[in-house]
Amino acid sequence: MKILQNKQLVKQTLILWSAFLILACQTGETPSASVDSMSYLLPESSLNSIESHLDHAGIIEALDEESMKRGGRTYNYNCINCHGNMEVEGSIPLATKFWQDTLKVGTDPYSMYQTVTRGYGSMPPQMHLTPRERYDVIHYIRQNFIKEENPEEFSSVSRTYLSGLPKGDSLGPATKPYHPWSDMDYGNFFINTYELVDAETGPERYHSPGPSPFPDEDYSANNFAYKGIAVRLDPGKGGIAEGNAWMIFDHDLMRVAGGWTGEGFIDWDAILLNDRHETYPRTVGKLHFETPVGPAWANPATGSFKDPRFRARDGRQFGPLPKAWANYRGLYHHGDKIIISYAVGQSEILEYLSQEESDGQIVFTRELNISKASSRLKMRIAPAKYQVAMSGSGASLSQEAGFWILQGEDIAKANIKLFISEPGFAQIRSVAENAAPPQDLSVFTQGGPAHYPQEIESVVTVGNDDNAFAIDQLTPPFDNPWKCRMKLSGIDFFEDANLAAACATDGDIWLISGLTSPTNTLTWRRIG
């Protein structure tokens, strides 16, 4: 019986991994000079109904300089990542180099449209683009690369050619903004690398120009949180992207890197977000306060704030502080509250980031529950130019060497609330006096209601068991309440072969049941 269970588990593993590879991206080229309907990754039955009504000739005839500009933006925003250009190598060596390679499935616009729409070899279907956007980028590739640099592969468009294309009466839907990375409900926190900047006064984004290897940029004055936990502070639905006030906790250095307000959260520039390579997300909006890159808490053994971490050749320091100094434990997500847990020396700390408002002025708050320490703790809150106040007991507030300093007292514990605002906000002490007292944050570490109680069903397309290797295709729930993109990246199984857990590159985690069900129906529940 145990052997049968293990065989079933192995089969399910092969089925799931094969399905995920098929659904995520195809990584092998098909060595074929001709194309039939089975060579494309996406069958005709999976295409949108609009595809059968497209006026291909009408779209192609309308291509112009504006189409070239739009197509260039699409290519340099998306396609360049894999294909590269004449100066920069793409990330996939086998991806077609339009300026020198022989195209496997035709160079006329309609043949290229089939490749872009349905996928072929290592080229996944680009169904997120409208038909006109697909033809725009094809126009850019044909005119900019093939016609100019690879003329042997260029095929002209004639009246005879256009008359032979499939007939239709639609140009497809109008182009709409496409930003699924910011549409998704990630929840009220999001862990990433961030640069904190003010939209009006911050430094302009800079990358070294030219082909790789790029020379080092000078980021010595930039405020990066490499292990940043961004937390939404204002109430409301939609997760962190729908908020209008945030703070970032840097768990390398146990510092709050800053707080900002605005619309949009970040600019979403990152390979795992909007697919842009060699970049990082920046905050967007008004930066109300920030702290310099460096330890927030003094070394409990020496009282020094000197940063001991690895220094790279460009002068920046990376990595966490030594564990004896500070150690990030994790976080608790209770309702809409995010409780961050870490240790400084022998002292355990729970921290909750939030906000207060007074006469339209936002005040950023930090609640800290600090256990008794074996040595007196000292924390840099913010540079002295900002307004800072405190309520609660067990610590004192002062200024030292250009910073507001929180100094722990020799008592059993501290339970305090810090208030931080822009320079010149004189009412901050009044806000602190009238605000609710600091809470016992341990209450929010005991678990709470499920954040994602919904269950979603999808189907299994069963393969042929007569062959040596059977593949069943599992359909992820692309249509889900949180607009998760379902970019599945990992899977693990339970002892019960009917159950699996999968994670996605966007951070969502799913519990899957029904793997051995005869109904060929899967049930998905988001658990993180």
Question: What annotation goes with each model-predicted range?
Answer:
Residues 457-462, 474-476, 498-528:
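Beta-propeller domains
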Residues 155-352, 356-365, 382:
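Beta-strand-rich N-terminal accessory domains
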Residues 71-86, 137-141:
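The canonical Cys-X-X-Cys-His
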